[in-house]
Every structure is written in C-alpha cells, then in structure tokens.
Design a protein with these regions (language model features):
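Conserved catalytic cysteine-centered active-site region
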Residues: 31-50, 83-125
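Residues that line or immediately flank small-molecule/substrate-binding pockets and catalytic motifs
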Residues: 80
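Conserved "HGTGT" condensation-loop signature of ketosynthase/thiolase-family condensing enzymes
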Residues: 1-77, 98-103
C-alpha cells in the first residue's frame, strides 16, 4: 500500500470582479491591492455554487485528471474558509455529489471505504 498525497485539485468559479472596480467601490487605492498584494480580480460564486459544489468540482476533476479509482481512495481532505454545516464535514456533501456522477462507471457507493476531513481555517483551507 502506498501512503501520502497522490494528487491535489481546486476549483475557481467563473464569475469574477476586477479588483480595480472593487477598490473604487470601497474607496481603496487600486494600486494598494494590485501592486501591494498582487490582486487583479476576485472570483465569487454563482447563485447555485457554494463550498460543497466547489469541492465536488475539484474532486471530480482530480479523479478524472489522474485517472483515479474512487474505490481506492481512503481519505479526502477539504480545505475551506466556508463550512456549510457545524456538524457534518462539507467534504461529505462533495463526496455524495461526485459519487452520484461516478455511479454509472464505478457502481453505487464507490466511496464507501473513504473518510473525509474538513480543515476550516483561512490560512490552512
């Protein structure tokens, strides 16, 4: 058995706001954000997106890009600043969404031997 991180993935929403526009609305000098922090645009979720759908998109991309078998994945770590539920890891929602998409290729409950961990903290997530 091989241990360690085999792959990582992320999802960036397609909607964004130019930092210059944000700075002007907030009465901040645009150069402070553009040159000082290196920011040029800020992505934000569409009405049907949240932390769980971002995670599901990233997980599905990871599985497809690395040709992974979900039945062989034993743990999924999710890093986020935005938990959906104080009792249930956001990664469980993502895993359930991806499991539904992968059911025809890998069978029902293809993640049944996988556990999930959320890391909800701005600097870690």
């Amino acid at each position: 058995m091989i241990y360690g991180i085999e792959a990582a993935s992320f999802h960036v929403p397609s909607l964004y706001l130019e930092i210059k526009d944000l700075a002007e609305k907030r009465n901040i000098e645009p150069a402070k954000l553009e040159k000082g922090l290196g920011l040029h645009k800020m992505a934000f979720p569409d009405v049907h997106e949240d932390a769980a759908t971002f995670a599901a998109e990233a997980l599905l991309k990871l599985i497809r890009d690395y040709n992974l078998n979900p039945k062989e994945i034993s743990r999924i770590y999710l890093g986020t600043e935005s938990a959906l539920d104080a009792a249930k890891p956001t990664a469980t929602y993502a895993m359930q969404m991806v499991e539904t998409v992968l059911e025809k290729d890998f069978g029902a409950r293809c993640f049944k031997n996988c556990d999930v961990v959320d890391m909800t903290f701005a600097c870690v997530g």
